[in-house]
Amino acid sequence: IGVVYTKNGDYSAILRMENPVQKYSANIDSYYEFTQLFTAICQTLGEGYAIHKQDVFTRKQFKDESTDKHEFLSEAYFRYYEGREYTDSSTYLTITQENKKSSLFSFDHKKWRDFMVKVRKVHDQLKDAGVKASFLGKQDTQEYVDRFFAMNFRDKTVSMTGFKVDEETIGMGDRRCKVYSLVDVDCANLPSVIRPYTNMEVNSTSMPVDLLSVVDNIPGVQSVVYIQIIFMPNQKKELAVLDKKKNRHASMPNPSNLIAVEDIKRVQDVIARENKQLVYTHYNIIVSVAPNVDIQKSTNHIENAFGRTGIHISKRAYNQLELFVNSFPGNCFGMSEDYDRFLTLSDAAVSMMYKEKIVHSEDTPFKVYYTDRQGVPVAIDISGKEGKNKLTDNSNFFVLGPSGSGKSFYVNSMVRQAHEQNTDIVLVDTGNSYEGLCEYFNGKYISYTE
């Protein structure tokens, strides 16, 4: 396990994981299962820990990276998509233990052992929930930190450049970055009730999508990193502070104070009745654009998209460099307790995490290519039995559709790709649509007549 140390002596382990919810799957239960999983992880870690999830979205150009030699039609297929832009995503989960003494030289063997036990527990929880996750080693951890520092997630080699910082953006070499804090603690504009998903209208039909689905399609960007940080404080201490706040508001009766008292009572009731956990959270979006791109267009898109969900982006994120540095993997405890964190319940905090995954090619020796919703080829094992995740041991399937619906077009494409991979095919058809295909491949053609 690669471990990141900060100058204050905090140490962190980084997991590369895959979000469990398939994009556009319309499965509401999977969003709630994600919420339950990460709420349980917060309970497992407890006081003095933080989870720091980073979802990285990168605009790339499609390039066929398979080493196989293709026949003419397959070569033409991949050439057609060459250079097409699409969004790729990757997710990292950093688990950090705070060093209260704020010194690199205050090593505590007992705390270190507790840290190693808990990070392995989190890994087991993710694995038991069916989430793909693996710890980054020393070299991968170093590479990820360097890429984050340069905000470069697509080039094979990464170079460091100087920073030029103002109140609005951070300039670094051939790109500019801007950090958008989701919540202004002086004016927390969040909906009073939050769910882990929102509904999108598709052809007059409601479809559930991630509450934060807007972060993966921001126009004009090179890279986007959605930062989600949850800090686990001492529960008794926070409840005592809440009680003091309630009494202070109650001592000065006016409408706003009475509303505050009611809100605090409601939170205390939920904690007592349902054993909920109080957490501090911070969310921000780091956007990277080319120097000749107007970043205001991205700003307008983000503000409008989040405004529709009832979340209003902070307009006072003038501490750009501080936010960027404290968003580094393992450096989250540098976030200001007064201005960059806000208190809420753990399940509400987890609801604002990004939960979806973008489709990637399957890990299988048998590849049949389809285009995904972004219009780029994705390899799928349609047999369901050759890949790493075996779904069945029966490779039969049935193609049904009315005349002119494209059955032959699909079957010809699929048979061609399967034949290129030395697959034996038995094709049963009503009519003689595939007689020519059979002759082309020197197959055996059997027909029946009454």
PLM region spans:
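Extended, folded cores of ATP/NTP-driven motor/assembly subunits in large transport
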Residues: I1-E356
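Generic detector of bulky aromatic hydrophobic side chains
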Residues: I51, F105, H109, Y180, ...
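Short amphipathic alpha-helical segments, especially helix-boundary/capping motifs
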Residues: S12-L15, L258-V261, K388-L391, Y410-V411, ...
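Pre-P-loop entry segment of helicase/translocase ATPase cores
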Residues: A348-M353, I358-G375
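Glycine-rich phosphate-binding loop of nucleotide-binding enzymes
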Residues: I28-Y31, T35-Q43, P365-Y448
